[in-house]
Amino acid sequence: MSTTTALPARRALDSFAILLMIGLCAIWGLQQVAIKTTNATVPPVFQAGLRSTIAAVLVWAWARSRGTPLFRDDGTLGAGLLAGVLFAAEFVCIFLGLTLTSASRMAVFLYTAPCFTALGLHWFVDGERMRRIQWLGIGVAFLGMALAFADGFLHAGAAAGAGAHGSTLAGAAGDALGVLAGITWAATTVVVRGSRLAHTSASKTLFYQLTVSAVVLLALAVGLGQVRVETVTPLALASLAYQAVIVAFVSYLLWFWLLTRYIASRLSVFSFLTPMFGVTFGVLLLGESFSARFLIAALLVLTGIALVNAPAKRTA
């Protein structure tokens, strides 16, 4: 059997897709702030499970209103369940990893995802081959993202090295979970782009992921004793509404719609902007600090994105 999958050709990004991806990354970056502001009242895994549950209901209602079938047998069940499991596994790895390593180190390892996405698409999906200049762009963007979090990354590593041997091993395990989260994120994109899901509606693709992840995450929350809400505050309700309606429903639906029309590897590199937006919103809304190094890092990320999306030279 061939290792590649022939699918309808996707096109390079136009100005609309670029602006939409920047907007989506800003939404995802603000989500980091929303989660931070709610963690004290709603445990993170329970938050994620509630988010997926609410968003799944919204996707069902949206599909029903548009007459989009979600339960018709179209041969996507296997790929849909796999994508859902991978989607849930990403959040499980992030949660468990953050109990063992720092947020900065998790960010660096999690955002290896665009690198793994590019590799997976290059190997398994026709029409997603990347040129050398595009691989350079991936590397430059990742370097910029890593530079943005270098202080926290190195500080956490030094602290672990100065601690007990067990702390060092725990930190390494947390880092490994960060990489695994990046791999599962990338694998989700590859499954969606390289299977029958590429031929189905964005609503159905998202419904698979939300329903499976809701079951997995809520079950994990029960197992961890996290099914509780300390205090119902307006801020907590607003944060959960933002995560469920804006992020998990609207932005993910738009993301999967983009995957049906544009080259996935060129879209995925924009995700390097997400932690940059997260830092920016943290500075603006939470009063967090940042250094001049962050501006250099942002420039590197933008340069890398430009290289990945640079048009190929036409031959006579």
Stretch-by-stretch model annotation:
Residues 27, 31-34, 60-110, 120, ...:
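Specific transmembrane alpha-helical segments of multi-pass solute transporters/efflux pumps
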